[in-house]
């Protein structure tokens, strides 16, 4: 009879109990409080709250800007990860460290810096202003801020895959006469796709909930540049907790659905790469 190895961490029951306790304190209880506060509203009041013109406009602004930022992050993040892994150049370590700057930098500081940079008197903003393009206090500015906070998720998700990627397949394809574009789309990209989806999914969730860095550059004009987190904050300042939690619950549900869909896509891609059924 084969002897089973004892687990390094003693006591499965104790470990599971601690895990569930931490998960409950950090995730489940705060989420349950949203449901409890929202339950104070009738279904009719709930629908009226989340379908107010100002709220719907904030949903549109948040989701459209977040989606645009995620698409750009997916492209730019993959390129950055590729450059950091495949090439050696002066300042590579500095650039690699700067990727994580949005994680360490206070969001308010990031917002002020981005606003100063993209305003009409800023270095970047004044350049685009010459072409009649305004960045700060527009949806373009919101998208820029979301790109800033979201791009590390894509880079850090793609980097490990590139570092561990077996180059023999792409080299074999090159020997057989395949073009570089064909090698990338047919050999390299399928292996990167799960990591890109993972990074963009996390970035999308971060962009939707971002407040500090966006609120400074947005201009907060109702029905145009007002993001949903700001509407929630306004409701809280008016002590309307039920309305605030109702709006937050919608954001939570949509974010959870997108992350769940992203996870399903990753699992499907992983099965395809392992040679399983799609």
Locations of regions flagged by a protein language model:
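Membrane-interfacial helix termini and adjacent extracytoplasmic/periplasmic loops
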Residues: 2-7, 43-51, 56, 91-92, ...
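Transmembrane-helix boundary motif in ABC transporter permease subunits
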Residues: 2-8, 67-99, 112, 116, ...
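Periplasmic/extracellular loop-to-transmembrane helix junction in inner-membrane transport proteins
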Residues: 4-9, 13, 36-71, 86-89, ...
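Interhelical loop and adjacent transmembrane-helix boundary motif
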Residues: 7-12, 46, 53, 211-265
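C-terminal transmembrane helix and the adjacent membrane-cytosol boundary/short C-terminal tail
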Residues: 7-10, 14-18, 26-29, 33, ...
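Transmembrane alpha-helices
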Residues: 17-22, 101, 148-150, 154-166, ...
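Hydrophobic alpha-helical transmembrane segments of multipass integral membrane proteins
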Residues: 25, 60, 64-76, 80, ...
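Transmembrane alpha-helices and adjacent helix-loop boundaries
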Residues: 104-111
